[in-house]
């Protein structure tokens, strides 16, 4: 633990000094931004059915730094140092993103490790060929632990047309991701009659070719629909929508059906299962009530269901902000289904409760 802290503290100190007004020139041409987030979280698993500790603790330190020089050059990095204790203590430093970019007119060039989001789905994605793995029980990546891929990207905008070409490694400098291959991908985006649409073609080195398309359409201020269609050996389909009530509550619903092929199959799922069908429902509200003491609260409740084996998992999140620096939260999960023959029923606990606090500067 001490080794990781000693590595991160000088880095954070450098970020603070980078914006020292005494070291800045009289007429600065650059813009610097930085932040530091510290999270302490404790968790408890009730009804644990496997050997091991039922309680754990997580300490997470996340510094970010960004520098922009004029309208052309930019640099950004985001790190995550974590110390997890669950019976034993493990330490890790993750490089979430580190990249440099250059802009020349309508052309953007980027090189480095970066997080992309090409899929339009909230809890699932069929076309997010370069996206971090989507987790239906944590679609927002609440602890910000997702990592990007090392890549070179060229993006050119011509009117309402957007052309993006990407080459992504399977882990050029970092360790190779499980099952990842070098990927060459092309994305074409265009707005058609209010539909924000995109077509994507990609090829993995030594693997198969991927083709897909997605769309997003907003109607007024309350309704949004989205969909994805992808083909890699077989078809994967996603349909979803979001509706915002006058009370401020937001409802998100999605239906997702991936084939049971090597690319779409979750780790540990047998090949004999066949095509799967999932449902997702989320109800939430930010600023619970516009009253002192209430508007700092955010709550969400979600349900993920496997329609084939009847298993499901419920998720509840509640959080409260204090003076724009502190955020206390609760995260709970409760799976259900046949323990031996269902996806979510096989999760080895009856409930998981996590309570934490975050400080940001």
Question: Each predicted region: which residue ranges?
Answer:
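Membrane-embedded beta-strand positions of outer-membrane beta-barrel proteins
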Residues: 34-40, 77, 109-111, 154, ...
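Repeated loop/turn-to-beta-strand initiation elements of outer-membrane beta-barrel proteins
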Residues: 71-75, 106-109, 160-165, 192-199, ...
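Detector for outer-membrane/organellar transmembrane beta-barrel domains
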Residues: 28-34, 192-194, 216-305
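Outer membrane beta-barrel
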Residues: 66-170, 190, 337
């Amino acid at each position: 633990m001490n080794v990781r802290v000693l590595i991160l503290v000088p880095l954070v100190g450098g970020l603070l000094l980078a914006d020292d007004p005494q070291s800045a020139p009289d007429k600065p041409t650059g813009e610097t931004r930085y932040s530091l987030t510290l999270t302490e979280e404790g968790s408890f698993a009730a009804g644990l059915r496997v050997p091991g500790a039922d309680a754990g603790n997580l300490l997470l330190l996340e510094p970010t730094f960004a520098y922009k020089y004029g309208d052309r050059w930019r640099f950004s990095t985001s790190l995550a140092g974590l110390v997890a204790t669950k019976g034993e203590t493990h330490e890790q430093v993750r490089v979430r993103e580190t990249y440099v970019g250059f802009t020349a007119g309508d052309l953007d060039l980027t090189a480095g490790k970066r997080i992309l989001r090409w899929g339009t789905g909230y809890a699932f994605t069929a076309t997010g060929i370069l996206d971090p793995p989507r987790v239906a029980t944590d679609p927002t990546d609440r602890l910000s632990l997702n990592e990007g891929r090392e890549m070179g990207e060229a993006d050119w905008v011509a009117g309402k047309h957007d052309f993006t070409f990407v080459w992504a490694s399977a882990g050029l400098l970092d360790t190779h991701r499980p099952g990842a291959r070098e990927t060459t991908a092309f994305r074409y985006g265009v707005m058609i009659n209010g539909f924000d649409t995109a077509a994507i073609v990609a090829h993995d080195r030594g693997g198969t070719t991927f083709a897909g398309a997605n769309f997003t359409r907003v109607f007024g201020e309350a309704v949004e629909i989205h969909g994805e269609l992808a083909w890699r050996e077989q078809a994967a389909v996603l349909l979803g929508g979001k509706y915002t009530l006058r009370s401020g509550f937001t409802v998100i619903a999605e239906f997702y059906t991936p084939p049971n092929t090597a690319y779409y199959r979750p780790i540990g799922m047998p090949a004999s299962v066949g095509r799967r069908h999932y449902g997702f429902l989320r109800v939430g509200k930010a600023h619970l009530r516009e009253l002192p003491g209430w508007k700092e609260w955010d709550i969400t409740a979600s349900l993920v269901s496997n329609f084939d084996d009847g298993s499901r998992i419920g998720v509840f999140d509640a959080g409260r902000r204090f003076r724009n620096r502190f955020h206390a939260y609760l995260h709970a999960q409760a799976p259900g289904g046949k323990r031996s023959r269902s996806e979510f029923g096989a999760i080895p606990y009856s409930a998981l409760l996590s309570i934490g606090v975050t400080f940001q500067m």
